[in-house]
Amino acid sequence: MTTEEAAAQYGADSIKVLKGLDAVRKRPGMYIGDTDDGSGLHHMVYEVVDNAIDEALAGHATKVQVILNADGSVTVTDDGRGIPVDMHEGEGVSAAEVIMTQLHAGGKFDQNSYKVSGGLHGVGVSVVNALSDWLELLIHRNGKVHQMRFERGDAVTSLKVTGDSPVRTEGPKAGETLTGTEVTFFPSKDTFAFIEFDRKTLEHRLRELAFLNSGVTIWFKDHRDVEPWEEKLFYEGGIEAFVRHLDKAKTPLLKAPIAVKGVKDKVEIDLALWWNDSYHEQMLCFTNNIPQRDGGTHLSAFRAALTRIITSYAESSGILKKEKVSLGGEDSREGLTCVLSVKVPDPKFSSQTKDKLVSSEVRPAVEGLVSEGLSTWFEEHPNEAKAIVTKIAEAAAAREAARKARELTRRKSALDITSLPGKLADCSERDPAKSEIFIVEGDSAGGSAKQARNRDNQAVLPLRGKILNVERARFDKMLSSDQIGTLITALGAGIGRDDFNPDKVRYHKIVLMTDADVDGAHIRTLLLTFFYRQMPELIERGYIYIAQPPLYKASKGKSSRYLKDDAEMDAFLVDEGVDGAELDLASGERMTGQDLLALVQTCRSAKANIDRLAARAPATAIEQAALSGLLGESPNAAAAATRLDLYAEEGDGPWSGERGDTGFVFSRVRRGVSERVVLDDVLLHAADARRLAERAVKLTEIFSGRAIFRRKDKSTTVRGPLDLVNAVLDAGRKGLTIQRYKGLGEMNPDQLWETTLDAEARTLLQVRVNHADDADDMFSRLMGDLVEPRREFIQENALDAEVDV
């Protein structure tokens, strides 16, 4: 079937209705995922993007654009066929309205419209509509622009033609009339715990889609910041380029990834695999562009074929005989990075989250194609094949050595009744769910922790010095490390693929407690590397935590208080600074106590907005512009200029303001020298400017003129939020002695209990992995053998580093 024929058949009669959106609003988690942790929020974008990608899979689209708008909404555009706009016979309204308002409506139920698809078209976009405060739909089809608006899932305007579609100016269809769909939506605050999109989370998924669909260009833009950001995601190499991207911080054993492509029994397979010199496997599986975290029939088929082909080659080449080892499946996958993508007409998954593929017809197709492709490659590349199999044989030898070491340890443990490490101060509680273990840096801190702990349910394990970097060590070498052996024994869950059992771990809270200096951060990173590489299930189950000892101790007279970080320190200084203070406003009103504290909190939020915008203009100019209403809906340049005069000193001329081509321009003469300030449109449309404008509505009346802040015998002139925050913080510091902690050893047992061990008062950070491939890349870059990726990381993040010297 040609593209033209397919386009002709995709009309109103392609849309099948199966009804109702109320269920979505009542039980959003069933349709979109968790509405509290951000996964459901980002899934809203994925649902719309998946529709655009499905157009690309069907051969009708080449470009997708995702924009995070300054007002918090998202726009997704594609240059596909455009949603059908003709009337739907069964529903009596346009097909576009059916798709957007009926739960089970779409073109994915009709094999003529889409051969394969990631999800059910109408389900996804109608759910997005139901869970949005508003959604605007723009369709280019039949040479016309069609527009429609929805609020809370209901149409508030009918689909109407608003103009003619423009002509394409670039790409393979240049000169033709533009077709495509644009969806802009604002997620509902009533449904989601927060509605701010995370750029990195979206970028990760969009990059995956660009790799999996070579030839499709995805433009990702973020217009929320002062400096607009954009990235073009386009990879001609497809999943071969994906594997290279995943392995960019590792040393490859082959010049290029092995690629296997083919179609068998309507199952399309696209595979790329590449061995490197690391000791860890990285495997990503996709079905119709959807990732399977738990694998499934495609993964088991690939592994079976890989093990069979490699074992066969190792035997026929004589390498097995020479090395005197027997190969296992895990040996073949040591140092392997692989991306496996299958396209299946009607995939079946084990659950609604689609984390595991269970379609039985996929297994023989994948196994057959992989066996055939790998056999051919091994025959055509004998030297590289030999290098791979030699590495695998070495892995098998190391595995055997590690097995013998474990057997010795087991026998020793069986004979030794007190097999727990001598340094471990264990707890009396035997229920793992109630037990905690603190892994402490050094013997001195370990001694304090042992005295401070609650012996009923808190164990302490001090580790001296830096533990082995397991990223650069093979399994047998790792087992020979005393510190790692101590850690493994204390946890009681075993180690290695065959012996590790997370159900046997003796503590369900494993807390890393290191100093707040560079050495402490390094030791914590080494421990995290160990847990991520050797016991990832403990991270997945949420058992690993990082202790947050206080950073500061603030003392005044005989009283003292511990403060965990800079934010808590600032909050404490504000409380101190407001205590006994008063603010006399220009209106004659006086603010004190809770009213003043609430005002200062609002001013701190406004200051945070101003600080982020200050890269483009002076902070005081932004502040006074906001207070004049310049960032709101009715900007007045003259009013903003008048407010700027509050900062004028003797000899300064008055400010004047006007609207220029690219923003507002303010100028004055200061001691004979012309001065000019520009608040450009980029700043005016930034998300922080919008939030600042909302806060300024409340602040404008309070700061109508110069105010006076008084505390004890000192008074300060206040012209806006910036002056007030600085005056309060200065007042709060007066008479305080502030001590900064760097090591746990600096605290005595009582202090350690009060700040870090007491479950009622402490702060713990739970370690979680959102994207395994990103985590894998980060550990490889920072902890691996290659120096260049580490240098690049330092250069990229140097400005964000906070280093205590």
Curated annotation (Swiss-Prot):
Membrane spanning stretches: none
Record GO cellular component, one term: chromosome
Protein residues bound to Mg(2+) 2: 515, 517
Catalytic activity: ATP-dependent breakage, passage and rejoining of double-stranded DNA
EC numbers: 5.6.2.2
UniProt key word Cytoplasm: yes
The entry's keywords: ATP-binding, Cytoplasm, DNA-binding, Isomerase, Magnesium, Metal-binding, Nucleotide-binding, Topoisomerase
Site for Interaction with DNA, residues: 466, 469
Disulfide bonds: none
Induction / repression: Transcription is induced just prior to the onset of DNA replication, at the swarmer-to-stalked-cell transition, lasts through the stalked-cell phase and then decreases in the predivisional cell.
Subcellular location field: Cytoplasm
Note accompanying the cofactor annotation: Binds two Mg(2+) per subunit. The magnesium ions form salt bridges with both the protein and the DNA. Can also accept other divalent metal cations, such as Mn(2+) or Ca(2+).
Co-factor requirement: Mg(2+); Mn(2+); Ca(2+)
Binding site for Mg(2+) 1: 441, 515
Domain (Toprim) ranges: 435-550
GO biological process: DNA topological change; DNA-templated DNA replication
GO molecular function, one term: DNA topoisomerase type II (double strand cut, ATP-hydrolyzing) activity
General remark: Few gyrases are as efficient as E.coli at forming negative supercoils. Not all organisms have 2 type II topoisomerases; in organisms with a single type II topoisomerase this enzyme also has to decatenate newly replicated chromosomes.
Subunit structure: Heterotetramer, composed of two GyrA and two GyrB chains. In the heterotetramer, GyrA contains the active site tyrosine that forms a transient covalent intermediate with DNA, while GyrB binds cofactors and catalyzes ATP hydrolysis.
UniProt record similarity statement: Belongs to the type II topoisomerase GyrB family.
Function field: A type II topoisomerase that negatively supercoils closed circular double-stranded (ds) DNA in an ATP-dependent manner to modulate DNA topology and maintain chromosomes in an underwound state. Negative supercoiling favors strand separation, and DNA replication, transcription, recombination and repair, all of which involve strand separation. Also able to catalyze the interconversion of other topological isomers of dsDNA rings, including catenanes and knotted rings. Type II topoisomerases break and join 2 DNA strands simultaneously in an ATP-dependent manner.
Protein name: DNA gyrase subunit B
Annotated organism of origin: Caulobacter vibrioides (strain NA1000 / CB15N) (Caulobacter crescentus)
Source lineage: Bacteria, Pseudomonadati, Pseudomonadota, Alphaproteobacteria, Caulobacterales
